[in-house]
């Protein structure tokens, strides 16, 4: 097994195609573990993982917890709301104390962009970015890549329409960085106030017309309307948003008949996506969740078990 020649997973912008391929290949090899009657192997026995979340999470936090446990690691879950952070302890001090307890890897989600990079420089332990501010969400990007590869068999030449609030979406950024490395044609669509900026150099096309992005799309990635990160006035109302930019069955028919429908979750049904689309035959949303466990198992294996940093 080839080695992952890095200590930390901080983003996909600087990750090579070879590294991404290694992670996806490893995830595919480990994926069936989650479906076995006994979901446990001793690969990471004796290793300790801490998940440290300063923002709410269900899928990412719990899939990392399961990934570690399936591989035999000891896993502790720390929520900022119930930790010494409430007493004024800094992020760096919290992580250093965890390392002093023998933690081998820290999974961090934080509202501040660059927080995982700060920890990576301060710790000997591996740091995995589980989402930092408006920066990146690399493990979501990797599980999206795995889902597309398994369903489509390729990336090059695919038209991928990313619909919704890309401005506030770290998922969109990681998806863009990964997909464009493989030659996919990426479109962003949504209100002009919610479109990510500065991706022209990556070959990304933007439009305020959802229909233009969906026309002939092979993959449709719908993004959540992140009201908690927004200022007022970025769009009229939630109802108006759904009317003009929501992905409905009628709009999805503009994509290719075999188009893949994805969403990083959590869903706002009736806002960015209709229930008929979310639960329809083209939806791979639950498959993404399954692949999330596999990708996170692969990263833990490569960082702590079979892929020691060079």
Swiss-Prot record:
This is Aspartate carbamoyltransferase catalytic subunit. Pathway: Pyrimidine metabolism; UMP biosynthesis via de novo pathway; (S)-dihydroorotate from bicarbonate: step 2/3. The keyword Transferase applies. GO terms for cellular component: cytosol. L-aspartate binds at residues 87, 170, 224. InterPro entries: Asp/Orn_carbamoyltranf_P-bd, Asp/Orn_carbamoylTrfase, Asp/Orn_carbamoylTrfase_sf, Asp_carbamoyltransf, Asp_carbamoyltransf_Asp/Orn-bd. It catalyses: carbamoyl phosphate + L-aspartate = N-carbamoyl-L-aspartate + phosphate + H(+). Carbamoyl phosphate binds at residues 59-60, 109, 137, 140, 265-266. Its EC number is 2.1.3.2. It is an enzyme of class 2 (transferase). Transmembrane segments: none annotated. GO terms for biological process: 'de novo' pyrimidine nucleobase biosynthetic process; 'de novo' UMP biosynthetic process; amino acid metabolic process. GO terms for molecular function: amino acid binding; aspartate carbamoyltransferase activity. The lineage of its organism: Bacteria, Bacillati, Bacillota, Clostridia, Eubacteriales. Heterododecamer (2C3:3R2) of six catalytic PyrB chains organized as two trimers (C3), and six regulatory PyrI chains organized as three dimers (R2). Catalyzes the condensation of carbamoyl phosphate and aspartate to form carbamoyl aspartate and inorganic phosphate, the committed step in the de novo pyrimidine nucleotide biosynthesis pathway.
């Amino acid at each position: 097994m080839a080695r992952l020649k890095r200590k930390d997973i901080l983003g996909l912008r600087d990750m090579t195609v070879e590294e991404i391929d290694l992670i996806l290949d490893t995830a595919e090899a480990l994926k069936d573990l989650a479906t076995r009657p006994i979901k446990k192997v001793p690969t990471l026995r004796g290793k300790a993982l801490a998940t440290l979340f300063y923002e709410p999470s269900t899928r990412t936090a719990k899939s990392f917890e399961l990934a570690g446990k399936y591989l035999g690691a000891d896993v502790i879950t720390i929520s900022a709301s119930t930790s010494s952070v409430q007493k004024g302890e800094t992020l760096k001090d919290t992580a250093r104390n965890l390392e002093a307890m023998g933690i081998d890897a820290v999974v961090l989600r934080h509202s501040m962009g660059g927080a995982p990079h700060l920890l990576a420089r301060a710790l000997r332990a591996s740091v995995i970015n589980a989402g930092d501010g408006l920066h990146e969400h690399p493990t979501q990007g990797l599980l999206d890549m795995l889902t597309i590869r398994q369903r489509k068999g390729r990336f090059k030449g695919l038209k991928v329409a990313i619909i919704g609030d890309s401005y506030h979406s770290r998922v969109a950024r990681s998806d863009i960085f990964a997909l464009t490395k493989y030659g996919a044609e990426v479109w962003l669509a949504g209100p002009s106030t919610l479109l990510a900026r500065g991706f022209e150099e990556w070959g990304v096309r933007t439009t305020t017309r959802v229909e233009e992005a969906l026309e002939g799309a092979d993959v449709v990635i719908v993004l959540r309307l992140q009201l908690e990160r927004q200022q007022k006035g970025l769009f009229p109302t939630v109802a108006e948003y759904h009317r003009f930019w929501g992905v409905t069955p009628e709009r999805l028919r503009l994509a290719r008949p075999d188009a893949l429908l994805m969403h990083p979750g959590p869903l706002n049904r009736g806002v960015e996506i209709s229930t008929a689309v979310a639960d329809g035959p083209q939806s791979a949303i639950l498959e993404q969740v399954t692949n999330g466990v596999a990708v996170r198992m692969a990263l833990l294996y490569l960082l702590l078990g079979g892929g020691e940093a060079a």
